[in-house]
Design a protein with these regions (language model features):
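Conserved active-site and SAM-binding loop architecture
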Residues: 1-123
């Protein structure tokens, strides 16, 4: 499978897919923390490739409910809507297998409820 790991610079998830024999590419604005296939740049540059699976870890800075007290300012400066639009790049992608990791946030209201909720204490 061709797997894109978007907004991922640790290389951990990419390396797990590579170890299983998949073709995997991590992509982030930051350089990869480990050697391996990594595109340092805007994910939009590689999003149109024929991926079999996309796992995205978009920044939660402007989307999480823990920052609700700053939502008014984020609406006014546009960062809330920019974060939501970036999230939707993945949600609307035609790839059949898309997973988006994000904490509980405003996307449950703006987009839809998540298919799964996984808590860190479960692992």
């Amino acid at each position: 499978m061709r797997v894109l790991l978007a907004c991922e610079c640790s290389g951990a998830v990419r390396d797990a897919f590579l170890a299983l024999g998949h073709e995997a590419l991590s992509c982030d604005l930051q350089p990869s923390e480990t050697p391996g296939p990594h595109y340092q740049g805007d994910v939009r540059d590689v999003l149109a490739f024929p991926w079999d699976m996309i796992i995205a870890f978009p920044p939660c800075t402007d989307l999480t409910v823990s920052g609700a007290r700053w939502h008014k300012a984020k609406r006014e400066n546009g960062s809330l809507y920019a974060g939501a639009a970036f999230f939707m790049l993945f949600a609307n992608h035609p790839c059949q297998r898309v997973a988006i990791e994000n904490p509980v946030g405003i996307m449950s209201s703006l987009y839809r409820k998540p298919d799964q909720v996984i808590q860190p204490w479960q692992f």
